[in-house]
Amino acid sequence: MKFIVGIVIAVAMVCGVYTTNSITESIDKTSNNTVTTQTDNNYNKRILGGWESSASGGSYYVFNNDNTYYWYESSSNLNDNYYKGNMEILHGTDAMDELGITLEQVTTVMSNSNYKVGINNIYCIKLNPTYLISGGVDKTNTLTDKFNMKLLFVYVDENNAQAYNYTTNDTYYLVKK
């Protein structure tokens, strides 16, 4: 866990982050005429699209608005060696809970980044592959739960992010493509 907090601190110190606090609320009536309030945040929209690893020949993630994703071994070949599947995006305190990140750890990160990184920059992206192409061959029938991944995704700005893959223990510096 200290390693993960170190990653978040490094992002905060090196890149800086712009956050917003715009949350809109909408009132929705349920079938029994009880009024409920739903928080509609647009934070997830900022991570949608393609994110390429800054490493030479690095992997490429595409997060879609319909809760699907693609993971490509390389952005230079989008026809082979890729997964596609379903994803769930958790944001803020929900992401922290899922990943086991404490408020104390985030507070330390916020302080070390001069309050440029905060809870609104933290995401948990749960990836569940449903389709696999490897070496030009459909290998979907080989997928098991061990292929599910969980990412800590720290949004830096509209062009930069950092991710830590809890499943593989890999760290990625990502650039919006």
Tell me the role of every PLM-derived stretch.
Residues M1-N21:
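Sec-dependent N-terminal signal peptides of Gram-positive bacterial secreted proteins and lipoproteins
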Residues I7-I9, N32, G92, E158-N160:
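Short, intrinsically disordered, low-complexity terminal segments
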Residues C15-T34, Q38:
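Sec-dependent signal peptide cleavage junction
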Residues T30, V175-K177:
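Short, solvent-exposed mixed-charge patches
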Residues T34-G50, V62-N64:
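N-terminal helix-cap/turn-to-beta initiation motif at the start of protein domains
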Residues S54-G58, S75-N159, Y166-V175:
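Contiguous, well-ordered beta-strand patches that form the walls/edges
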Residues N67-Y69, N159:
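Structural signal for glycine-centered tight turns and loop->strand junctions in beta-sheet-rich domains
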